[in-house]
Amino acid sequence: MAIAESFQLSDGYSVYAGVRARRDGVVEDAAFALAKIGGTDGTSAASKILEALLRRDVSLVMLDGCIVSFYNWVDGEALYAKFKKPVACYVFEEPEGRVEEAVRKLFTDWEVRIEAIKKLGPPTVYYTKSGYKIYIRAWGIDPVDAGRAAEYCTGFGKIPEPLRVAKIIAGAARQFLKTLGKFRFLW
């Protein structure tokens, strides 16, 4: 199972898409949720998707990043505690920038945000057999095992197929919602 998001700052919201996929990457179902850009509702959006898609046979929840939507976040530990399924957060590019410094400048509730981001913990670097570097945070599963799981369902490149598909679907849904906004007079 995988959850990814898509946003543009001008939208004011981020579209989260989740897919339930088999180990071979074949997608069986999808669900959506919205979160506010710069909000604090990323975990809630991911939780709504899990409520819609989770089954007993799901063995891992994959997240495309934990710090998302302009410093919103998804709390993998909270999802693991609530749903009793291992959760792994993957980042495919080297983390850059000074997150704490930016959060202090941008948000009045910066203390709460920094505490939540620190609670995520530092990522573990995992090197794939094909030489890619993945940054992994994990709850209920060893980060190395989460890396192996990602490799297992990666057809090409470094992004596991369920996350790649979830990201594509999130982007398409965001574009569709923007199109609907242009035609509100029809309803």
Curated annotation (Swiss-Prot):
UniProt superkingdom: Archaea
Span of the signal peptide: none
One Pfam short name: DUF99
Record family assignment: Belongs to the UPF0215 family.
Protein name: UPF0215 protein PAE0952
Organism of derivation: Pyrobaculum aerophilum (strain ATCC 51768 / DSM 7523 / JCM 9630 / CIP 104966 / NBRC 100827 / IM2)
